Amino acid sequence: MALIPKEVFFVSGVGRHEDELVSFELALRDAGIERFNLVPVSSIVPPGCRVVSKEEGLRKLSPGQIVFCVMARYASNVEGREIFASVGAAFPEDKDMNGYIAEHSGEWYEGAEQHAKRLAEEMLKTQGSKVARTFAITARGKVKEFTTAVAAAVFVI
């Protein structure tokens, strides 16, 4: 059986806790994807994969389900710093071609979210595709205790 995603949705979240692992769990909870066994995959959006809302995507998943995603994650405990995690997506004009998702994370700077979009767009262009549209989602937070930012493109098979 081929595991080709039919749909994708985008989420982001921030978590804070004295323990780094718990801050990650809280970031997943803030994003709404803490109830799944998340498996990281690389950057391909299959041809015909439809973008759906977070709410629609979550309705199609079950607690404990193995779920594939492209995730950006960044954690810090350096108080006062501002961190981020972004995923950017680029979709081709030609519906028979694949799109791309790019992860980008670190300490916040102006243009960070746009950089994630540009990365995905550049990967799409290198396959000779024209870009129909781009999208990005970002989690951003000021560090207090351990702080984790996550952004993810979550696939529905």
Curated annotation (Swiss-Prot):
Report whether Isomerase shows up as a keyword of the record: no
The PTM Pyruvic acid (Ser) maps to 43
Q: Which InterPro entries match?
A: Pyr-dep_his/arg-deCO2ase, Pyr-dep_his/arg-deCO2ase_sand, Pyruvoyl-dep_arg_deCO2ase
What GO terms in the biological process aspect are recorded for it? arginine catabolic process
What is catalysed by this protein? L-arginine + H(+) = agmatine + CO2
Q: What EC number(s) does the entry state?
A: 4.1.1.19
Q: Which HAMAP family match?
A: PvlArgDC (MF_01404)
- Name of the protein: Pyruvoyl-dependent arginine decarboxylase 2
